[in-house]
Each structure stands twice: as C-alpha cells, then as structure tokens.
Amino acid sequence: TKIGDKPWIAKFQKRGDSFPECRVELATMRLASECGLDVPPLDFRCVLDRDIYLIERFDRIPHGNWLERRPFASGLTMLGAHESEVSSFSYADLAGAIRQFGTKVLQDLHELFRRMLLNILVTNDDDHLRNHGFLFDG
C-alpha cells in the first residue's frame, strides 16, 4: 500500500483474533528501535475496529511514478537452505554468510548479535531464516 509517496507493508488483524498480534509486533519493533537496532519507519491504524500494523518498505526506492526494487535475499536463500532444513541452521551460519558476502561485516555482525539478544528476550517464536535478509547495497 502507499502512504504519501512511500510504499508500506500492511499487516491486518485477523477477524475474531483475541490476541493483539499487530499491536505486539509494533511494540516489539519499537523496542528494537529503542535498543538501537536498524528498524524501518512504523505506523499503526485502526479501521472498522481492526488493527493495521504498517512497515515502510525498505526494499523499494521511489522514483517518481515507479518503484525501484532493491536486490534482497532471505537468510534461507543466502545459506542455500531448503525450508525442510531450517532447524539445522543457526545464527552462527547467518554470521558466516555476513562474513562471506557482506561489505559492512563488523557493523552487520553487531546488528545480528543485538537482534539475536532481542529475539531471545522477547521470546520471539517466529525467528527463522526467512525473517533474516540481506540487501545488496553496492
């Protein structure tokens, strides 16, 4: 979706959902930002009594009437893994991919470590290779 001239990802509350997933995810991302992690701009709306959690797209660059796609690959792709193998990979494997493919290795390793700590502290049960990614910035 678009807000102003920028593209955003919208996550909607499920009908009949008693757990406020959108609000929890927003609060967790704001906590991540307060902890110094690299977090895109966030927003929250409530429309017709349904929560909408918004994240500004970090993988698109607006150019007038069109959007340039920033090259992106998930941790799963960067490790050459298959969905059925995700449980056999770890943060150490992601760190290895950063060392192998990264251009800001020390900065990105620090970011990965801080993300790992936050995920542990908030008991993130959705921490998997698809939720870690690499952006080409060259």
Residue ranges and their predicted role:
Residues 19-31, 90-138:
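Conserved kinase catalytic-core segment
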Residues 1-88:
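Conserved ATP-binding subdomain of kinase catalytic cores across diverse folds
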